[in-house]
């Protein structure tokens, strides 16, 4: 059965690195990264005369949901041609909604004969902070300048409804706070995705 793999977590947990490394080890896979849409989003900020801030009300109201809509549409198209499609994106709000995830599962099964697999990248908040500093990305400027306010709103807990999956590979937890955890998780998760 085809699979749509969502690699999710709060920002700077290592989604991109994990996603890229998994994609290298899997066959017949399409890799999609929501960050690819950032240049288009920057133009929207510019045209609207708004300061570029991915934590702003403007972003939340006009851009955020459209980015997810577009990346999912690309994934649906890719499922017509590939066995595995992997999306690297936080899905911060969506992943907490049981009805959203159930609806996505149903759509994938009915329209694409595909299964949803969620990989939760689990990383300590301290590690995320250090990674955010190291990557030095403009998308993190506000977060780093307002770290205490930002981190107080980030939920690092796996949503309860995801822990109730019917199948072993509905939810895979990728531990990623150290190189040792990364290697162990890679060894455990890659074979499950091949099935």
Region spans (language model):
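The Walker A (P-loop) glycine that initiates the GxxxxGKT/S ATP-binding motif of P-loop NTPases
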Residues: 9
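ATP-binding Walker
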Residues: 13
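Walker A/P-loop
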Residues: 16
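Conserved substrate/cofactor phosphate-moiety recognition/catalytic segment
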Residues: 20-70
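Glycine-rich phosphate-binding loop used to anchor ATP phosphates in small-molecule kinases
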Residues: 62-112
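Conserved phosphate-donor/acceptor-positioning beta-strand/loop module used by diverse small-molecule
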Residues: 111-132
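Small-molecule kinase domains that catalyze NTP-dependent phosphoryl transfer to phosphate-bearing small molecules
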Residues: 122, 133-185
